Amino acid sequence: MLNYDAVRQRDFGRIVHTYAQRDTMLYALGLGMGADPLDEGELRFVYEKELQAVPTMATVLGSPGFWWKDPATGADWVKLVHGEQDLQLFQPLPAAATIVAVNRVVAITDKGEGKGAIAVIERELRDQ
């Protein structure tokens, strides 16, 4: 049974994450960027010269890992579904940086017996 108090009060601490240009390029390559070597729109994400980070890379930086597997949550992690994700950027993500992430559970809604719950987790990234 889900332990709502343990989930809602989960302390992730501050997560410091350093990534380099190589990481930025590998992320983009993993998305299929650069498959067409003549597509200049994609080359900016995989080539060192004037390298840019794919904006969605922010969704994987500063992750607290798979914390739902912690028995203290009471969650049946095998049945978890990632339902949706939202991203707000206030400036471009640097191609290389050290960031600090703060993760927090901002809401949890019980859908009823045997139907699970919806949890909203927020992650804020800032320059260190």
Regions found by a protein language model. Give the residues of each.
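Hot-dog-fold acyl-thioester-processing enzymes
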Residues: 1-82
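HotDog/MaoC-like acyl-thioester-processing domains
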Residues: 1-9, 63, 80-128
